[in-house]
């Protein structure tokens, strides 16, 4: 199991889509941050400010990345990248845990 050490976790969570997607921000000593969260089954669209690496730790979803009309299947243990200043769509098939790194 992967774990982070010497970090600060923000107590207040981030909640989207009436609580169907939630996360907590993890701040690292070097100033970087990640969010750890989960998504309930459903369809969602997200916007990015910074580029992101989305690591799916468990669950299953389909993602449609910016500039593509193709849906990609992603399962626990897989990841995908999203460019800055863009939008992407997901269809979550079952409860999905994720780690989002801001690049």
UniProtKB/Swiss-Prot annotation:
Keyword Glycosyltransferase on entry: yes
One Gene Ontology term, aspect cellular component: cytosol
EC number per UniProt: 2.4.2.1, 2.4.2.2
UniProt keyword terms in alphabetical order: Glycosyltransferase, Transferase
Molecular function GO terms recorded: guanosine phosphorylase activity; purine-nucleoside phosphorylase activity; thymidine phosphorylase activity; uridine phosphorylase activity
Regions that span the bilayer: none
Gene3D superfamilies, alphabetized: Jelly Rolls
Pfam families: Ppnp
Reactions it catalyzes: a purine D-ribonucleoside + phosphate = a purine nucleobase + alpha-D-ribose 1-phosphate; adenosine + phosphate = alpha-D-ribose 1-phosphate + adenine; cytidine + phosphate = cytosine + alpha-D-ribose 1-phosphate; guanosine + phosphate = alpha-D-ribose 1-phosphate + guanine
Family assignment from sequence similarity: Belongs to the nucleoside phosphorylase PpnP family.
PANTHER family hit by this protein: PYRIMIDINE/PURINE NUCLEOSIDE PHOSPHORYLASE (PTHR36540), PYRIMIDINE_PURINE NUCLEOSIDE PHOSPHORYLASE (PTHR36540:SF1)
HAMAP family: Nucleos_phosphorylase_PpnP
Summary of the function given for this chain in its UniProt record: Catalyzes the phosphorolysis of diverse nucleosides, yielding D-ribose 1-phosphate and the respective free bases. Can use uridine, adenosine, guanosine, cytidine, thymidine, inosine and xanthosine as substrates. Also catalyzes the reverse reactions.
Protein name as catalogued: Pyrimidine/purine nucleoside phosphorylase
Species assigned in the record: Sulfurovum sp. (strain NBC37-1)
């Amino acid at each position: 199991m992967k774990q982070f050490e010497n970090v600060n976790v923000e107590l207040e969570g981030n909640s989207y889509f009436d609580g169907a997607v939630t996360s907590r921000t993890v701040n690292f000593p070097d100033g970087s941050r990640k969010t750890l969260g989960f998504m309930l089954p459903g369809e969602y669209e997200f916007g990015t400010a910074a580029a992101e690496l989305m690591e799916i730790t468990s669950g299953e979803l389909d993602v449609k990345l910016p500039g593509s009309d193709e849906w990609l299947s992603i399962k626990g243990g897989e990841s995908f990248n999203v460019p800055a200043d863009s939008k992407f769509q997901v269809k979550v098939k079952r409860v999905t845990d994720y780690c989002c790194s801001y690049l």
